[in-house]
Each structure stands twice: as structure tokens, then as C-alpha cells.
From Swiss-Prot:
This protein's name: Forkhead box protein P4
Organism field: Xenopus laevis (African clawed frog)
GO biological process, alphabetically ordered: negative regulation of DNA-templated transcription; negative regulation of transcription by RNA polymerase II; regulation of transcription by RNA polymerase II
Pfam family, one: Forkhead
Gene Ontology molecular function: DNA binding; DNA-binding transcription repressor activity, RNA polymerase II-specific; RNA polymerase II cis-regulatory region sequence-specific DNA binding; zinc ion binding
Record's keyword terms, sorted: DNA-binding, Metal-binding, Nucleus, Repressor, Transcription, Transcription regulation, Zinc, Zinc-finger
Length: 641
């Protein structure tokens, strides 16, 4: 308002004492004008008339002071206009001063300048107003096009709203033109302090009519804004559950029936997730719809935005959440299964049948004849059985193997589950999973030959059996074939026979059973101390007392050596020898008479290239190595762990 105090002229105001008076008076007028603009809607007609008279008197005094200032201050600028009119006079409204008063106060040139200023200001305001209206309409159209979720009813409502806004703009334009004409006739002026949106009225309109007109205009604007807000909230509330149900897919149709405008009906039909194969896929609704138009009509009528559709949407959200939880659980279960299958368990399977080391020679001989393949032998005496052999042998292996990591499966595991039963139980696993089988090449070759009806295979047939039974050999480099040929030529249990088919390989079971790992011999006291020191705490008292005695008549016979070796070694066929070849003296694997008071105790081998840790023994302890035919020196790089 302080800007209105300055007069519109090109030359600066003189700096004498008289020139400061109009500024003060103008500032007072501006403050009073602003006050009047603020309180105009609250004054009664009598107070308003009195206020207008005071404004006219102040205007007259201001005009006189302005003229006096112009006369007293000499002009030095050639561009000084001949007519000077203060802005406050140009901004005076008809309620403040009547045309008669203006004619009495102002000269004709000043009146013309006031009219020109009013017209220029009004044109500027009209341009700004129309520009803002166009921007608002453009934003509304863009928002509707981007949303693309208007139904025909809502589109018709939007068209009506646009038509109403256009009519309102036309009425405002006509009103502005009428006001300009009236201003040219020197009847009305522009209201001071008016905003960019002019709402003018005729001077003859009473204050009550003006108030009613303003109320109607504000109510219409509120209704339009409320409608826009309702549309926006509807789009938000309907799009939220759809996005919650299926986040990665943008639904072309929302739960309240709103659909996007597509370029082609076929593309819209193919991408609509609630319509397929001629029926509605809304949960719980299987209504038949012949075409897309009928489906859209059904969707808008039966599945509109109501309580039932909202409840169904919430139920669908809960269903999806439950499925996500179930999927997470199943994924964790699958991960645990994969981890278990790819990592061998730390503890082997428990042994089911207890064994006896003390038995008669005849029973041992019969058992050895009955179980030629080294299978577990049942107990043959009524003596108390020992604890499962797995525990004691595991202790021996752990004492002789300080290293950790992927190691050869222990003989006790093979003793509990022979290779035939192992392959039968885990046939599908080895066939599909790329896991290295825990058996030596010799045992696998023997198993391949025994599975054939005629007990003979060619070299290519052995290769095919390896690749057919194990995914590991099928998917890795075929360097393992060298190890197969090496084992076939090394071990005397594999016999090469020439027949009609060519060269075939067979297996000699008796020769195969003679294959034994390095054995340790010692006195019975050593055996007792070693077994008790290595964890045989669960041995019963009768067995410990039997070991403490000096004479073992039942342990001296050769069949018992085989039986005890079968028990301690598990009768298994594939243990790699780690003894040094230089120590072999070509003696028979049976013990000489001077070692008749000793028994055989198996030393668990470590990796193929690592010698086992020796166990301390008395001076009479002697290690006897079998002959060369018992050695199973496979290729170090190709030996199975």
C-alpha cells in the first residue's frame, strides 16, 4: 500500500518541504483504503456512506497538495507529462467516490488519465486471469489423461464441469467488457487492492445482492474443488488394493470398474487379468461374458466400488500374504534339503546289529562261507554283545586323522551300508546330483560287473555304467577313465577274458576277498589297552576280562583271524593301502606261528598320499604287510574321497 502514495510522473519529486506532505497524506489514504477494503464487508450502509464521504474529502485534499507541489517544484526534465494522477485515485472504487465527485475534483485531462490507467490495469489483470484459467484447465486435462480411469458417467460429469467452467469464463469476459464500457463512460472505477481474479459488480447493485452473488460464486467453486478431491481420493483408494494384490503387474481395470483407454480392444482383452476364456475371474464370480464389452458392463455393475468389493479385495490381500508366507517356508525347506544333500553328515548312520568278537572256530568258518562278500555277520554266541562298532572305529579314525575337510568315507559307514544297498537306496540321487560317490574305483567296477546277468563287461560298457549311474562322471572331464583302466590292470581280482564279443572283464570273488588293508599285530594286553584308551568305555565286563587273559585259544586259529578282520574291517572291499611298498617281504597274509598269541587290529587309513599316525606299542609289536596283490594303489589324482 505504500507504493500507492507515489504519484505517476516521469520527473522525480522535488525535495523541498512541501513535497513531503503528499507522501504522508497518500500513506494515510493507503492505510485507510486498505482498512476500508478489509472492513467493507462488515459495515452497514450508513457507515459505508459516511466512510465514502471521508474518502472523497481526503482525495480532494491530496489532489490539491499534489497540484501545489507540481507548481512549486520547477521541472528540469523535458519528458515530464502535463497531467499527473496519483495511483490511489486511479485505484479508487465506485463505493469510495461517485462520478459526480470525481468530476468536481479532477480536471478533464486527469479524468482521461484515470480512465487510461484503469483500462491498462484491467487488461493486465484479465490477461493474468485468463492465463491462469488456461493453465488450470490444461493441468486438469493432463491429470485426467494420465489417470485414464474415467467411466462414461464420470466422463460425462467431467464434460459438464468443463462446459460450466467455459460458461463461467464467458460470463466473466462479458462482465469485464461491460465494466470497461462503463469506465469509459466515467461511471465506475476499479476497486483498490483487488486480487488477480476480478469479481466486479455494477455500482447500482446493492450490498446484499453483491454478497449473495459472491456467496453463489464461492459455493460453485467449492463444489468443483470437492468434486476434484473426491475423484482424486477415489482413484487413490481403488488403486491401492490392486497394487497390493499384484505389485509387479499394472492392472488395466481397478476393483471399482474403472478401466484404462486402450488403442485396441484385443490388446486390452489379452492384458486384462480379470477376464479370461469368456468368464469373469473376480474371486468368487464366474459369470460368463461373451465379449469384452459385456465383461466391462458386468464389471461396472457387479463389482463396483462398494462394501462387498472392498471386503473381497481385503480377503484377496490376506490370501496373497498367506501364500507369500507359505512360499518363504517352502523355500527355506528346499534350501535346507539342498544343504543337507550337498554336505555329508558329520556322524555316520548308527549300526543296527551288535557283533561278537569271541566265537567258535566252526561258527566263524560257517559265517565266512555264508557271507563271502564281506557282509555284516550276525552274532553267533550267547555272550553279551558289545556296543556298536561304529563308535570305537570312529575314535580310531579320528585319532589317526588330525586333518579336517573332505575325507574318504569311513569303513564303518560302508560296513553298515554296503555299496550295493547304498546305490540301491540313493540311485536317483547319484544319477541326478553332481556328487562324487564315496567308493573306490575297484568297488565300483566290481559292482558294475556283478549287476550284469553274465557277470562280464567290456571296457566301454564299464564306462557307460559309470556315466549312467553317476552324474558326477557324466558331467566332469573324462580323466576318470584312466583310473578305471589303471584299476582293471592293477588288481588281480579283475580278469580279462577273450570271447566272441571281444575282450571282456570279469571279477574273481575269492581274489577280491583277499584284498586287505595293512594290519597291525600285538599282544592281547596291547589290544586291551588300546581299545579301552580309544573310547571303548561301553564294553561289557565279560569281554574286558576275556581280553585280559593271557591265552586265547579261539583267537589262534586262522579262521578267527579272518573273522576278526571281517568284524573290525567291516568285511569291506575298497580301502586304499597306505603302507610303503619297500616293506613288503612277499610273505603270506596269514600270520607266522611265532605270532600265534596276537590278533589283528585294523588301522584306519587317511588320504591316499598321507601315512596314518602310528600308535605306540610294546617292543614285541610287529607290523606285517600283505603281499603286493593286496595293494590297491590307485591314481592319486583320480582316487575317490
Amino acid at each position: 500500500m505504500m507504493v500507492e502514495s507515489e504519484s505517476i510522473r516521469s520527473t522525480p519529486t522535488s525535495q523541498n518541504g512541501v513535497g513531503s506532505l503528499p507522501n504522508q497524506s497518500d500513506s494515510c489514504v493507503g492505510r485507510e483504503g486498505s482498512g476500508s477494503g478489509e472492513t467493507n464487508g462488515e459495515l452497514n450502509p450508513a457507515e459505508l456512506l459516511h466512510f465514502q464521504q471521508q474518502q472523497a474529502l481526503q482525495m480532494a485534499r491530496q489532489l490539491l497538495l499534489q497540484q501545489a507541489t507540481c507548481l512549486n517544484s520547477p521541472s528540469t526534465d523535458n519528458k515530464q507529462p502535463s497531467v499527473q494522477v496519483p495511483v490511489s485515485v486511479a485505484m479508487m472504487s465506485p463505493q469510495m467516490i461517485t462520478p459526480q465527485q470525481m468530476q468536481q475534483i479532477l480536471s478533464p485531462a486527469q479524468l482521461q488519465a484515470v480512465l487510461q490507467q484503469q483500462q491498462a490495469l484491467m487488461l493486465q489483470q484479465l490477461q493474468e486471469y485468463y492465463k491462469k484459467q488456461q493453465e488450470q484447465l490444461h493441468l486438469q486435462l493432463l491429470s485426467q489423461q494420465q489417470a485414464g480411469k474415467q467411466q462414461p458417467k464420470e466422463l460425462a460429469l467431467g464434460n459438464k464441469q468443463l462446459a460450466f467452467q467455459q460458461q463461467l469464463l464467458q460470463m466473466q469476459q462479458l462482465q469485464q467488457q461491460h465494466l470497461i464500457n462503463l469506465q469509459r463512460q466515467n461511471l465506475v472505477g476499479l476497486q483498490s487492492g483487488q486480487g488477480p481474479v476480478p469479481m466486479q459488480s455494477l455500482p447500482q447493485v446493492s450490498p446484499s445482492d453483491l454478497h449473495q452473488l459472491l456467496k453463489e460464486m464461492s459455493s460453485s467453486q467449492e463444489e468443483s474443488s470437492k468434486q476434484d478431491t473426491v475423484d482424486l481420493m477415489t482413484s487413490i483408494t481403488t488403486s491401492f488394493p490392486t497394487t497390493k494384490v499384484s505389485p509387479p503387474t499394472m492392472h488395466p481395470s481397478l476393483s471399482n470398474g474403472q478401466n484404462t483407454r486402450r488403442e485396441s480392444t484385443s490388446h486390452y482383452e489379452s492384458s486384462h487379468l480379470l477376464y479370461g476364456h469368456g468368464e469373469c475371474r473376480w474371486p468368487g464370480c464366474e459369470a460368463l461374458c461373451e465379449d469384452m464389452g459385456q465383461f466391462i458392463k458386468h464389471l461396472n455393475t457387479e463389482h463396483a466400488l462398494d462394501d462387498r468389493s472392498t471386503a473381497q479385495c481385503r480377503v484377496q490381500m490376506q490370501v496373497v500374504q498367506q501364500l507369500e508366507i507359505q512360499l518363504a517356508k517352502e523355500s527355506e525347506r528346499l534350501q535346507a534339503m539342498m544343504t543337507h544333500l550337498h554336505m555329508r553328515p558329520s556322524e555316520p548312520k548308527p549300526f543296527s546289529q551288535p557283533l561278537n568278537l569271541v566265537s567258535s572256530a566252526s561258527n566263524n568258518k560257517m559265517s565266512h562261507d555264508t557271507f563271502p562278500d564281506g557282509l555284516p555277520q550276525p552274532p553267533t554266541s550267547a555272550t553279551a554283545p558289545i556296543t556298536p562298532l561304529r563308535q570305537g572305529t570312529s575314535v580310531i579314525s579320528s585319532s589317526s586323522l588330525p586333518s579336517v575337510g573332505p575325507v574318504r568315507r569311513r569303513i564303518v559307514d560302508k560296513f553298515c551300508t554296503p555299496i550295493s544297498s547304498e546305490l540301491a537306496q540313493n540311485h536317483e540321487f547319484y544319477k541326478n546330483a553332481e556328487v562324487r560317490p564315496p567308493f573306490t574305483y575297484a568297488s565300483l567296477i566290481r559292482q558294475a560287473i556283478l549287476e550284469t546277468p553274465d557277470r562280464q563287461l567290456t571296457l566301454n560298457e564299464i564306462y557307460n555304467w559309470f556315466t549312467r549311474m553317476f552324474a558326477y562322471f557324466r558331467r566332469n572331464t573324462a580323466t576318470w577313465k584312466n583310473a578305471v583302466r589303471h584299476n582293471l590292470s592293477l588288481h588281480k581280482c579283475f580278469v580279462r577274458v577273450e570271447n566272441v564279443k571281444g575282450a571282456v572283464w570279469t571279477v574273481d570273488e575269492l581274489e577280491y576277498q583277499k584284498r586287505r588293508p595293512p594290519k597291525m599285530t600285538g599282544s592281547p594286553t596291547l589290544v586291551k589297552n588300546m581299545i579301552s584308551g580309544l573310547g571303548y568305555s561301553a564294553l561289557n565286563a565279560s569281554y574286558q576280562a576275556a581280553l585280559a587273559e593271557s591265552s586265547f585259544p579261539l583267537l589262534n586259529s586262522p579262521p578267527l583271524h579272518n573273522s576278526s578282520g571281517s568284524v573290525l574291517h567291516g568285511g569291506h572291499d575298497d580301502v586304499t593301502s597306505t603302507g610303503e611298498p619297500g616293506n613288503s617281504n612277499g610273505s603270506s597274509p596269514r600270520l607266522s606261528p611265532q605270532y600265534s598269541q596276537s590278533i589283528h587290529v585294523k588301522e584306519e587309513p587317511a588320504e591316499d598320499d598321507v601315512r596314518p599316525a602310528s600308535i605306540s606299542a610294546p617292543t614285541n609289536q610287529t607290523t606285517v604287510l600283505p603281499e603286493d596283490r593286496d595293494l590297491e594303489s590307485e591314481s592319486p589324482m583320480e582316487d575317490l574321497p
